């Protein structure tokens, strides 16, 4: 999905256009009478990686609108993917959030984090994945561990989303991928 991207040194800035997200809602009714809209239109800049890896990146953004996030995502295809987000929640907090999609998406708020900057990490060993967050880029804490039915080569990269708002800049710094 198209967007504006700027790269300078170890900094990548991606503009998240308005009403962009990766989320596959189910057709079930919920108590509130509405469900998240299914969208797979957020800008996703990725590379393909074979086998085990660890991706780390420092992320930040302005936290203007609900569900704004700077994220990292792994993807087999549009029905099988997962994202690790630093997001403005519907509770008004900044949090480490994860979504795993195997047909339908789930959504799990993790820890609330202070400030507008965090580190995100995704680790792969075989078909097992772990998402971690950090405030200092040194001490990482697990937010989610899961299994995905993926092939040896998957897409791994940066995702910028603004599901409910007008969009904005997402900043990614010190990106590293270890194999």
Which residues make up each language-model segment?
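Extracellular glycan-recognition regions
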Residues: 1-179
């Amino acid at each position: 999905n198209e967007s504006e991207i700027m790269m300078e040194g170890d900094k990548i800035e991606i503009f998240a256009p308005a009403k962009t997200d990766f989320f596959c809602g189910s057709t079930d009714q919920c108590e509130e009478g509405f469900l998240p809209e299914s969208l797979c239109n957020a800008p996703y800049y990725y590379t393909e990686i074979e086998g085990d890896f660890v991706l780390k990146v420092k992320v930040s953004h302005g936290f203007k609108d609900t569900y704004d996030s700077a994220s990292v995502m792994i993807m087999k295809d549009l029905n099988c993917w997962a994202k690790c987000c630093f997001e403005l929640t519907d509770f008004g907090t900044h949090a480490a959030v994860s979504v795993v999609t195997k047909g339908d998406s789930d959504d799990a708020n993790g820890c609330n984090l202070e400030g507008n900057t965090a580190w995100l990490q995704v680790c792969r060993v075989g078909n097992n994945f772990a998402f971690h967050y950090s405030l200092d880029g040194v001490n990482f804490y697990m937010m989610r561990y899961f299994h995905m039915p993926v092939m040896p080569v998957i897409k791994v990269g940066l995702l910028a989303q603004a599901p409910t708002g007008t969009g904005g800049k997402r900043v990614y710094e010190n990106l590293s991928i270890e194999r």
